[in-house]
């Protein structure tokens, strides 16, 4: 008898034997919430507990429809700009970070601010300020219009040039070849970013690297796990929202690593049964802003379709935890 591991899903188990002819799910580990998302979501929850609703949140706290809808039902009010927040009210800044001008606008309206910016995004902000003080040209690799990019660029608007994909490389101009550095959005594809850096370095031989890797540990870990399982997958399902950069990148990584097909789904109801025709192995993962309950829903739906064996594919163990913002930490 093939030994199995109970996965806590009706009808699903993880076999330690390779049975390629039986319908199965390869489940990426790690997946889902990263430390920054966990901190941001808990920040809004704690603010609601401490102050009661409404608690205003500038932009989606994280890029996931389920999370935003759940917090909205609990009393969070999501706005695009601080001028939509009543004077003197509480406003939480999202995990993606904000530019200094946003803090200034909040202060003018006497808003009580709680900063849920991911500490790894804050690190990139600090790097941008430091290099700007030293009069560097900063080449920021990222997606135009993404909240994180807007926030980072806002730290040093006169020094930052956005490089959005390989096409953006040729548009870059610099003042001093000895004073040019690249930084990046934290949720990009590692491979694509390194390709852009290599192209930039062909133009600017003295291009400096950031002091430490800007692409966050969770983004990298989730991409590595997908790369490990994709070659064995007929189909990869990435649980995540379409405005989630890191989730979209996982679909691209899966296809690039050998999966025959890959799709982004917000939840189980998004699965098109035609995708499963002729499919033996389905890979499942989730973006860094996705709660595990949505992954469980997908696994249950797959089990109903005969994919009742779940095999974990573990490439890293994550233990990092970030402290909550001081404004909502429990009293000692």
Curated annotation (Swiss-Prot):
Catalyses which reaction(s): isopentenyl diphosphate + 2 oxidized [2Fe-2S]-[ferredoxin] + H2O = (2E)-4-hydroxy-3-methylbut-2-enyl diphosphate + 2 reduced [2Fe-2S]-[ferredoxin] + 2 H(+); dimethylallyl diphosphate + 2 oxidized [2Fe-2S]-[ferredoxin] + H2O = (2E)-4-hydroxy-3-methylbut-2-enyl diphosphate + 2 reduced [2Fe-2S]-[ferredoxin] + 2 H(+)
Amino acids binding isopentenyl diphosphate: 63, 96, 146, 244-246, 289
Catalytic-site annotation from UniProt: 148 (proton donor)
Residues where dimethylallyl diphosphate binds: 63, 96, 146, 244-246, 289
BP-aspect Gene Ontology terms: dimethylallyl diphosphate biosynthetic process; isopentenyl diphosphate biosynthetic process, methylerythritol 4-phosphate pathway; terpenoid biosynthetic process
CDD domains reported for this sequence: lytB_ispH (cd13944)
A molecular-function term among this protein's GO annotations: 4-hydroxy-3-methylbut-2-enyl diphosphate reductase activity
Cofactor needs: [4Fe-4S] cluster
Key words, A-Z: 4Fe-4S, Iron, Iron-sulfur, Isoprene biosynthesis, Metal-binding, Oxidoreductase
Statement: the UniProt record of this protein carries the keyword Iron: yes
Cofactor stoichiometry and binding remark: Binds 1 [4Fe-4S] cluster per subunit.
Enzyme category, top tier: oxidoreductase
EC code: 1.17.7.4
Record carries keyword 4Fe-4S: yes
Matches recorded under NCBIfam families: ispH_lytB, PRK01045.1-2, PRK01045.1-3, PRK01045.1-4
Family membership noted in the UniProt record: Belongs to the IspH family.
Stated name of the protein: 4-hydroxy-3-methylbut-2-enyl diphosphate reductase
Organism taxonomic ancestry: Bacteria, Bacillati, Actinomycetota, Actinomycetes, Mycobacteriales
